[in-house]
Amino acid sequence: MVKLDRRLEQIKKMFVDRKKYFVINRGRQYGKTTTLRELKKYLLEEYIVVSLDFQELGSAEFVDESTFARAFADIFVRTLERNTASSMKEMSESLTKLRGNDDDGLKELFVRLSHLCADSPRPIVLMIDEVDSASNNQVFIEFLALLRKYYLNRDETPIFHSVILAGVYDIKNLKLKLRPESEHQYNSPWNIAAKFKIDMSFSTDQIAEMLEEYESDYHTGMDIDGMAEEIYQYTSGYPVLVSSICKYMDEDLPEENGFEQSSKVWSKKGIKRAVKMLLSENIPLFDSMVKQLDLYREMREMMEQILYQGRKISFSPAEKSINLGLMFGFLKEENGHVAVANRIFEMYLMDLFIAEESIRSDMYLCGQVVRNQYIEGGRLNMKLVFEKFVQHFTEIYGSSTEKFIETNGRRFFLLYLKPIINGTGNYYIEAQTRDARRTDVIVDYLGEQFIIELKIWHGNEYNERGEKQLAEYLDYYHMNKGYLLSFNFNQKKEIGVKEIFIGNKTIVEAVV
């Protein structure tokens, strides 16, 4: 398990000790619940911590004020009794009164909570996990409004020392979710919340530290730093993705052919295999992603433009689709532009988009029909893939407009390639080089890598520069052969496939 000591220390010093009320809102399975659980242990010496989970409350508990107040008081008292037995004597009378009468509302509940906080021998920290469970209920918004009121008056009226809410939605978007009319979208009932900016992703150092502990127990002989960096390259530190890859490697890979030895499992090849296993599973995180993409079509269209067209979209968290993508953990800011949060998300989304489009795609069908001829002795003949793609693309789309090809050309190639490598290989788009004119695709097939540059052709000078860039990129990957697919709109273009030599590099170039 990745150590959270540094994160817990930061939260305590920057927020809890300073009496802050705040929200930890991150994407699904981003370590929120784990952080709250560990933070509770970390705070117990100085504070009384009441940690609640709103998933314990059903929708019936939010039907009205009285029902919610009674349910909240009940879960609060049970949690306090279970976890703070040593403090119970001094607080017993306040606890007894907290449940109140059946017809008491939120105002009466907060009066009793104030008395409880006044009687407490130590400051009380309130944590509420899964606040999204309450997000469609007006009574919860009113609960937040009273928290805000007591927070502002706490110099005169005792109340919680610190309040921590955790969920996917931030408070502003809880309001948006409840009342989507434009005039109400941004009226937060809880604008006293401190901004929570602590990075909850795992760094390469944290991943390495976890692998080091594993290595001390199992002696696999792995390259710890190299493995940590490779895992980070796929996940960007998204907690559940890091832990899932490691779990597949620990539990599932040793049962597969070629991975009988632990040194084979804990290798870059093992990571690639674990990633492939992860992408083939319907994990809750992926299910949630599909659901949100269906709900927010503009966000989905933006992701398609980024991945398929290499479109550069300026980063602005005020833009609704970008804000939602950040909140769900699907997007991030990168050099002033919007980017998909990590490589695994990119691979999953590409698989999803292509699977949906493959049903009606002529290019996918062409790749599927002739897929077997591209495999020779267990190796993928990428030059032949290029030759056949040029043939099929010219037959189907040769007379299409420049705008149509510029927008869709790269998507057609990826649709063509997918059935050829499906089940055996995989590919991802290199974010470092993705732009409106140039995109690099890296294909993995049975341990062999192919670097493919997809490029919109804009004259000889630009083309020669693209060839040089690809040669430099091959140096980075320590490879001598690369592939260049140019979508050329010059009427005098020479359609076909040829080989170009730059220094000791061979570039197979296809022009369509």
Q: What are the roles of these predicted feature ranges?
A:
Residues 413, 441-443, 447-458, 473:
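Conserved catalytic cores of phosphodiester-cleaving nucleases, focusing on short active-site segments
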Residues 99-170, 177-184, 464-471:
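Conserved Walker B catalytic segment
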Residues 203-328, 334-335, 363-375:
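Winged-helix-like regulatory helical subdomains adjacent to P-loop NTPase cores
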Residues 1-42, 112-116:
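Walker A/P-loop-proximal flanking segment of P-loop NTPase domains
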Residues 416-447:
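Active-site metal-binding core of divalent-cation-utilizing nuclease and nuclease-like domains
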Residues 49-50, 62-89:
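Conserved NTP-binding/hydrolysis module of P-loop NTPases
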Residues 463-467, 474-502:
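Nucleic-acid nuclease catalytic cores
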Residues 23, 44-63:
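Conserved catalytic segments around the Walker B and adjacent sensor/switch elements
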